[in-house]
Amino acid sequence: MPGPSPGLRALLGFWVALGLGILRLSAVAQEPFWADLQPRVALVERGGSLWLNCSTNCPRPERGGLETSLRRNGPEGLRWRARQLVDIREPETQPVCFFRCAATLQARGLIRTFQRPDRVELVPLPPWQPVGENFTLSCRVPGAGPRGSLTLTLLRGAQELIRRSFAGEPARARGAVLTATVLARREDHGANFSCRAELDLRPQGLALFENSSAPRQLWTYALPLDSPRLLAPRVLEVDSQSLVSCTLDGLFPASEAGVHLALGDKRLNPEVTLEGDAIVATATATAEEEGIKQLVCAVTLGGERRESRENVTVYSFPAPLLTLSEPSAPEGKLVTVTCTAGARALVTLEGVPAAAPGQPAQLQFNASESDDGRSFFCDATLELDGETLSKNGSAELRVLYAPRLDDADCPRSWTWPEGPEQTLRCEARGNPTPAVHCARSDGGAVLALGLLGPVTRALAGTYRCTAANVQGEAVKDVTLTVEYAPALDSVGCPERVTWLEGTEASLSCVAHGVPPPSVSCVRFRQADVIEGLLLVAREHAGTYRCEAINARALAKNVAVTVEYGPSFEERSCPSNWTWVEGSEQLFSCEVEGKPQPSVQCVGSEGASEGLLLPLAPLNPSPSDPSVPRDLAPGIYVCNATNPLGSAVKTVVVSAESPPQMDDSTCPSDQTWLEGAEAAGPACARGRPSPRVRCSREGAPRPARPRVSREDAGTYLCVATNAHGSDSRTVTVGVEYRPVVAELAASPSGGVRPGGNFTLTCRAEAWPPAQISWRAPPGAPNIGLSSNNSTLSVPGAMGSHGGEYECEATNAHGHARRITVRVAGPWLWIAVGGAVGGAVLLAAGAGLAFYVQSTACKKGEYNVQEAESSGEAVCLNGAGGGAGSGAEGGPEAEDSAESPAGGEVFAIQLTSA
């Protein structure tokens, strides 16, 4: 083998150097010398190799080595030896590491081998194993070991039968055998048995090695000790066939059983069927020679055999021979009948046996008509093996005689119904069979005897029938009668009869038929027969059933009509009728009269004058004209006419309709004016007038005499009358005239010359109001916001003093004369109108004091308070003390142009 690799040599050198160093240290310490072997204990797979390191701490040993019986090689040093043991096969070996250092130093090791369970053998099973008997399972695992680490398991399929561990066996022991005795069962049939071996070396740091044997299949069987049941005849006739059967119960598996059936030296071909654990074989047995033969049945299973045997006697027994002296004999001729059979058979002719077995039997007689077609029978019996066998023969005699026409075969009188096909038969007795011919005595029609054909009245009459053969002829007269049903035609019995009310009439029908019929008529669904003259009244009109009765009875329906003039009945044509719009209902006016009168109703006055009233048809159909949408109410005159007269009736027609709510009566979007009279959000058409209820969010609208802004919203309105209801969703909007809700001045105190001030006017109105301003003439630099609600003045001057009028306008009115007066630095006046100079001078001192002392800080104006007060109002809405002086000036006269008294506000302009 090759030496150690360079890497291994380096490793060994390192260990040697390390060991020498340790030895030096030991020598210095004067420790005892020793020898060491690594590894001391090892487990190696059989045939493998192992490196051993033998070393000592002796500084200079005289000699050393590794003693073992195994092949080895490897490097060495002064104080160490490295050896590779190869092809280790012995179960156990003990190598010795030794060195000579004044004394002999030794170290012993232990090397053991293991072998995997590569071969697991299950001893072959018997080809068939009887159920209920024991068989042996034996498993061998040669060479595997150590045995103490082995475990063997015997298995049936995946089921463990027995498991054995060999723990505690000697370490050198190898291989193992496990044997078990098992009782064979039916369910073991076809089962696979196997052996599993486990070598567990995990405690030694190795793995678990497993292997299993090839499975061996077991075939079990059960065969009863009883013999098969054989069913077969005791005797069998030559060249005849007979069924034989063989049955055996208690087989397992029955499908594996074999059956052998044979008669003598001839093997039969059985048909085998299985019935649970029973096998049944049936076959057809036949033999060609007389004698005693053995019938054998054998059943084999699992190498065992059960059989049964029976003796069968094969015989020959011909049928008896029956002869007639003349098979066809003339009437009155002597006839001899003879019956013969085999030598051992006893014959019997017509119940009379022969004198002895093997003797013939005879019968003689004179042939007569009654013997024609007579059959003669002969029986032959044979006693064989305790059984009585019998056979018979027969012969028929034909007797020749002249024709005979009997009433049974050819009646003198025939009666047939007309119409259905019949087969006309007139048969004669005779041998040979006679030919029969039937024709009228006057040489007319000939009957087609024996053929299927229709029966007509023309066939009725008397015929002469002749039957003839070689023995003679016979003649007979026959009469044919053809019956037919009564005929009720339109001449003798018309289908429709018309009588006039008040006259005399009778209902009679004449019918023809064979045999002659009788005729009677009754009213439909009544029992009384109509006879004699009748005084015609309307109640006689209707349908009558006339019956003509003979053997082929016939019935016919006759409709009798009684005519009379028109007449109106209140129940079928009412005097008062109400038409409901949309009901698709027409006026029904049914008039009594025959023929059916025509009816027409025409308006006589008012809106319906000259108009035709549509009438409901008597027999409605899809093609009838459509129902009119509008029908004029009023008085109509109905006239009914037929050929016998006319009748007149007056009908009052009124029209009603279900509720209807649409944009014409109840717009879905409505606009109301605040303060107007409240009429409700909805109305509806209909007759009678519908009742309308409206609710908003489920609550009914409160009753208010005048429209309020709170009435705005969406309503569900339902209109109802006797003919139905209608609903509609209505959205209500409320509009109102402008009201100035806010007037504000900023700043709220005085304005110095050159300062800025702003006037704001806000109005409430729907639709929204348009705002406009009127400023003092010549006031410069006035600015307005986009919607005119704010007026601003930058750099106020004396020219900005005066009236500023805010006007709010929409379609329902306007609010105006909201006035602000800007006073100059020396004049402090705030009054409701443009008063004269004298009045202003007189009131100046008091007003200046009012302006200076009033808390006008908020800069807001409450229009509603101002409209209800005659006082001058401050910008924050507080009342002033101008009193009546403001009401009596010229400005008060101008107030007639506006809906409310003008309000005046003062903004003080002070010097800079």
UniProtKB/Swiss-Prot annotation:
Kindly give the Pfam families that the UniProt entry links to this protein: ICAM1_3_5_D2, ICAM_N, Ig_3
SMART domains membership: IG, IGc2
Any one biological process term the GO annotation gives: cell-cell adhesion
GO MF, any single term: integrin binding
- Localisation per UniProt entry: Membrane
Q: How is it placed in the membrane, per its record?
A: Single-pass type I membrane protein
PROSITE patterns listed in its UniProt record: IG_LIKE
Outline what the protein does. Answer: ICAM proteins are ligands for the leukocyte adhesion protein LFA-1 (integrin alpha-L/beta-2).
**Protein name, entry field:** Intercellular adhesion molecule 5
The organism named in the record is Oryctolagus cuniculus
